[in-house]
């Protein structure tokens, strides 16, 4: 028997599926692996981007919260538009000694500082402060407006009479000469029951027409 000859159809079929024309299992596996890696890389990149954006948002939120906390923290105090005046009229010692029930007027009087208000005193109580004069008859201070009337009344007023007597016992000091009234001295007893040495009261009545101790009578 002779050698077999291969048919052209069989050779052509063999060439069509031989060599690099046929996809190998390794190439298929490598292609699938590359696709999986590309998918994983894309997923990882998108995840990293999402994580970065989330972390930046959290940082902004924490910064905003911390700024709000600082602005409304315990050191910040609300300022009211109402200003309460300081009670600077009284010192700390006065405020410590005063009680809540004590009125303001009593606190001012307790300080002992007299307060003079101009016009609070009538003119006839302090005429020497307002251009008054001293009456030569009764030695009283009179305002200028009442000078003429007062002089007429003093000059026309009758002299005070007295009773002459002899002192039976010591009676203290004479208000005119400032000497002692001794037993046996001649005295003058006025209607107001004041007693003086007779010589002292006579000299007094030469200028004045009233008792030395009661000029208004």
Swiss-Prot record:
GO terms for biological process: proteasome-mediated ubiquitin-dependent protein catabolic process; protein K48-linked ubiquitination. It is a peripheral membrane protein. Keywords: Cell membrane, Cell projection, Endosome, Lipoprotein, Lysosome, Membrane, Metal-binding, Myristate, Synapse, Transferase, Ubl conjugation pathway, Zinc, Zinc-finger. It catalyses: S-ubiquitinyl-[E2 ubiquitin-conjugating enzyme]-L-cysteine + [acceptor protein]-L-lysine = [E2 ubiquitin-conjugating enzyme]-L-cysteine + N(6)-ubiquitinyl-[acceptor protein]-L-lysine. Residues 1-27, 63-111 are annotated as: Disordered. GO terms for cellular component: cell projection; cytoplasm; endosome membrane; intracellular membrane-bounded organelle; lysosomal membrane; membrane; presynaptic membrane. Residues 68-100 have a biased composition (Polar residues). Its EC number is 2.3.2.27. A zinc finger (RING-type) spans 174-215. InterPro entries: Znf_RING, Znf_RING/FYVE/PHD, ZNRF_ubiq-protein_ligase. SMART domains: RING. PROSITE patterns: ZF_RING_2. Pfam families: zf-RING_2. A lipid is attached at residue 2 (N-myristoyl glycine). GO terms for molecular function: ubiquitin protein ligase activity; zinc ion binding. It comes from the Eukaryota. It is found in: Endosome membrane; Lysosome membrane; Presynaptic cell membrane. Pathway: Protein modification; protein ubiquitination. It is an enzyme of class 2 (transferase). May play a role in the establishment and maintenance of neuronal transmission and plasticity via its ubiquitin ligase activity. E3 ubiquitin ligases accept ubiquitin from an E2 ubiquitin-conjugating enzyme in the form of a thioester and then directly transfer the ubiquitin to targeted substrates. PANTHER family: E3 UBIQUITIN-PROTEIN LIGASE ZNRF1-LIKE PROTEIN (PTHR46661), E3 UBIQUITIN-PROTEIN LIGASE ZNRF2 (PTHR46661:SF3). This is E3 ubiquitin-protein ligase znrf2. The lineage of its organism: Eukaryota, Metazoa, Chordata, Craniata, Vertebrata.
